[in-house]
Amino acid sequence: FEKAGDCTIATITENPKIAEYNAMIIGNSDLPPVADRLPDDPFVSIPERFIGKHGGQLNHLGNAHEAGTAEFTSARNTNLVVFDDVLGKIYPLVAQSWEWNDDFTELIVNTRPGHKWSNGDPFTADDITFWYNDFILDEVMHPKMPALWKVGGEPMIAETLSETSMRFILPKPKPGLIAQMAGYYGATYLPKKFLSQYYPKYNPDADKLAQAAGLENGYAAVHLYTHGTDWTDAMSPILKDKDAATKLGRHVKPMLEPWILFSSDADHRKWVPNPYYFMVDSAGQQLPYIDHLYERFVPQREVRNLMIGNGE
């Protein structure tokens, strides 16, 4: 990254208001220096036109939480791998690299050493394995396993090889799996350290922990933090059960996205920058540039048109 960005970790600069925004993320502790918040090898995003600067707010109007806001929310989508701008070549994003075996039945995914979740916890290969084994394959979380993550009608095997390396073993060859990950609307990883405290298999007090927040059991807490991508469900724990999320100590689960949701109700959503975001620009500024994302929900088309015309 030093060659691409013409900078070193020691010269990375941060958003001057990042400590203020970090304080808005319920459950986050005080921030360490920016050099300690980035991976050893950050992703360098080289601007197409010019170097940006931190600040500003991006406003968006939508009908409702579940009504066609994908073009706005997709700006935050942060997959292991990503298509380039013309949907051609696939590049590593959250992942540092990947490699197939000769017959496309084993996929090794390597993560970035030092990468961290939005609360400062380490992001490791185990978070990918946990997503598949303890979320996708879990019969409570998914009574019917999502067919998308089967190969030839059978589940894959996910195993952690090291802190920064994991492997998918496929029952049949599927070279298109990496493209499927690049185009997936969700994330193929979950914060194991945070969520495992609500799984009885990892924590014998999982149910008690959740029940103290007014939830039925530990799995209800996992559901609270993970099932917000289905249009039939509330889009965030803040909307589902803000009181329970507050008692559990975190309004949203730790994320890797550039912005973190901190406010949500029937008529709006607001985000602030992720203080541990793993990207920098070619001038060594930690991304994202934009301070706030603000989405307002206005169901009446005429009112939306008037607001747009007024520059709101």
Task: Describe the residue ranges of each PLM region.
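Short, well-ordered beta-strand elements
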Residues: 52-66, 96, 106-109, 128-131, ...
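Aromatic- and charge-enriched surface segment that lines or borders ligand/interaction sites
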Residues: 97-141, 167, 177, 304-307
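N-terminal low-complexity, Pro/Thr/Ser-rich intrinsically disordered segments
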Residues: 1-34
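Ligand-site clamp/hinge motif
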Residues: 111-113, 246-250, 274-312
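Surface-exposed binding/hinge segments that line
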Residues: 147-236
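Extracellular/periplasmic solute-recognition and catalytic clefts
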Residues: 131, 135-145, 158-160, 260-276, ...
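N-terminal lobe/hinge region of extracytoplasmic solute-binding protein
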Residues: 27-28, 32-102, 254-255
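Long, low-complexity, polar/charged, intrinsically disordered or flexibly structured peripheral segments
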Residues: 220-269
